[in-house]
């Protein structure tokens, strides 16, 4: 046992990984109408890694991420209004989306913690890891980036009339709108990444790899806004259910060695 512990101590590698990541974000949900479209994912990551043995270790760090996604619709929603109304009689609210696109953007800080395995060789180390990320959104915004949304009131039966462009009664045509997304302040996700670390002259490690993350909880805090009445993001509307963010992409960066065992300094490289 003492011999094993001694070998474990001598095998330890400590390093700081700094990566720039870029890829695609997909918001997974099934709206009643329209369809989500992918956006972009860009992040900067700084992670401490320690390999307790030659092949296994752990990592913990911090990410700063900027994510975008889109929602597209070109349809008409008809909602019966049967409660007491300003007109005194029931009517049908028509919400007309004409080539409409909503863009969602979020900026968040995440803390990944995971387990890592590596297969070392003289010039290349292959490393793969899995873990959990805890995220805190700093900003979450939406804007109508294309098309228009218009609300009209249709009175059927003997009246057979349609009213529009009466903003004081919620009937309007709008080409632009922007605001905050009511987002959950705690974002949890599973992540996996892999990288090839290329070593030159023992101490200049460049890594290249890929990453994937999958959200565990609903991205937003509510789904109670009626599109066309409340000027909210589609993500907070009654047209959507659970919103799950998915990110996939590539990463490129450097690793800074800190120490190897008890006799290694920052200048001693990787072998």
Feature names for model-found ranges:
Residues 22-28, 64-68, 107, 132-140, ...:
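Transmembrane beta-strands of outer-membrane beta-barrel pores
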Residues 47-49, 114-118, 195-197, 251-255:
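Transmembrane beta-barrel domains of outer membrane proteins
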Residues 16-20, 58-62, 109-111, 126-134, ...:
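Transmembrane beta-strands of outer-membrane beta-barrel proteins
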Residues 244-271:
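Outer-membrane beta-barrel "beta-signal"
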Residues 13-61, 65:
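Start-of-domain marker
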Residues 6-8:
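N-terminal signal peptide c-region/cleavage motif recognized by signal peptidases
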Residues 13, 51-53, 120-124, 199-203, ...:
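Outer-membrane beta-barrel channels and translocator barrels
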Residues 28-38, 67-106, 137-187, 219-228, ...:
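Extracellular/periplasm-exposed beta-strand and loop segments of Gram-negative cell-envelope proteins
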